[in-house]
Amino acid sequence: MVIFLSFIKRYINEFVEAGSDIITFHPEADDNPEEIIKMISDAEIKAGIAIHPDVNIANIDHLFSKVQQIIVMTVTPGFGGQKFMHEQVQKIKDLDEIRKNNNYNYEIAVDGGVNNENAKICKDNGADVLAVGSYLLSQNQNNYYEIINSLR
């Protein structure tokens, strides 16, 4: 679950009670993202952050050791079907390097415009998880196994 809400703190308990196993949020949505990460972690749920395309990772790198997932947004959040922003691949690569150099355990996910033309680029640069909703649903076939395998 990725959340882009103001006042996220007031909803965390509800998401935990609903059975979430990971809660990922945009750190710029709150003045104290460390507190949100602690609230999520204290509930024994995995915590993650989603990085908006306009956010410089150097401004939030103090959060990386505290989370289990980082989502690189490769479109501007808001609606599906947007084009993949290739300039965000550098963030994927940088996050992978930071993870390796610091022995961090977060997974890197990519969300936004991922398809068969850019999935390999994302994986080759360190992505562990690819969100492919729009691509998957835009294919004119019902064999999701083949579609998903085309992304491997």
Regions found by a protein language model. Give the residues of each.
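Active-site phosphate/pyrophosphate- and oxyanion-stabilizing loops and adjacent acidic/basic residues
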Residues: 93, 120, 149
